[in-house]
Regions:
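Beta-strand/loop-rich accessory regions of lumenal/periplasmic or secreted enzymes
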Residues: 4-295
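Short, aromatic- and glycine-rich surface loops/edge beta-strands on solvent-exposed regions
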Residues: 1
Length: 295
């Protein structure tokens, strides 16, 4: 066992002013530019749709807020409940999206909800995104969950990176996969690995390769850290691919690196043959506050 020598405190994360930024608006987007970056924020997406820094595209699809994980064997009894709630098909509805320049940073304010089509929202949120001239992004998010809905598989951001962004470094529980109720065989350290090596190759495809309680993550050229520890997963397979395929030999790589940065993920439990997931391991907070820096 490892012994913590001091109590872990919440970080204070700020992004510094780094030069002038400009802001443009069109019907669908806010566009932030500097000498180094061109970032596009989708007004109807509630997140960035393009990130270009030093002439290189950092993402290959819009960022999204994600609530689904490919069910593990122990999710077999709760999977239908999650699907009925619409966690497997989240849809973002943006109510307002405004932006301004203050000093040398751009600020975007977004009020949105998450629901599946034809269902009431299960999450209502307000997000503040800050961007500096070097391309660092700070997200400050406050979300309220409708407690009539079941606990959530996960809640966080998904980034779709170029396939060659496969080098991974993190400080957290490793080197094997870890979850909030499955990390006793792991230890906290700084690990370097690759996207291929993060894969836990289960015969029946499912959520795998997560790393819990991370204070720093780097995948390819992008780094991330939160004021509180986060979970992350980087894979060549989408959650949808892992959900739909019955055998590991049927899996098809997406052609991208799918990077999940999670505020939280429910534990994996033992409900395939044992009791339901214990309440302390469920992601079921009525109010969530998340601060995250990506850059």
């Amino acid at each position: 066992d490892q012994i913590a020598l001091f109590e872990e405190k919440e970080k204070v994360l700020e992004i510094a002013e780094a030069g002038a930024v400009a802001l443009e608006e069109n019907d669908t987007s806010w566009i932030i530019t500097s000498d180094r970056i061109r970032y596009v924020f989708g007004k109807k997406k509630g997140a960035f749709t393009e990130l270009v820094r030093d002439g290189k595209a950092l993402i290959e699809a819009p960022m999204t807020f994600e609530t689904w994980r490919a069910p593990v064997d122990n999710d077999r009894n709760v999977r239908q409940v999650w699907e009925e709630a619409g966690y497997d098909r989240p849809w973002i509805r943006v109510y307002s999206c405004t932006a301004e320049i203050t000093g040398e940073k751009a600020y975007l304010h977004c009020d949105f909800s998450i629901a599946s089509v034809y269902r009431q929202p299960f999450l209502r949120a307000k997000a503040l995104w800050e961007v500096n001239a070097d391309g660092q992004i700070k997200l400050t998010l406050d979300a309220d969950k409708d407690m009539t809905f079941p606990y959530m598989p996960r809640f966080g951001l998904q980034l779709v990176l170029p396939e060659n962004q496969d080098q991974v470094e993190y400080i957290g529980y490793g080197p094997t996969e870890s979850y909030q109720d499955k990390h006793r065989a792991c230890w906290v350290d700084r690990f370097t690995t690759t996207v291929d090596e993060l894969l836990e190759d289960y015969v029946k495809p499912q959520e795998n390769g997560n790393h819990y309680h991370c204070t720093f993550v780097k995948v390819g050229e992008l780094k991330a850290e939160g004021t509180k520890p986060i979970s992350f997963n980087a894979s060549y397979y989408t959650a949808q691919e892992l959900t739909e395929k019955m055998h590991n030999y049927e899996l098809e790589k997406s052609g991208h690196v799918i990077w999940h940065l999670d505020y939280g993920m429910s534990g994996v439990g033992s409900n395939s043959c044992g009791p339901e997931l214990l309440k302390q391991y469920r992601l079921n907070e009525e109010k969530m506050h998340w601060e995250l820096v990506i850059g």
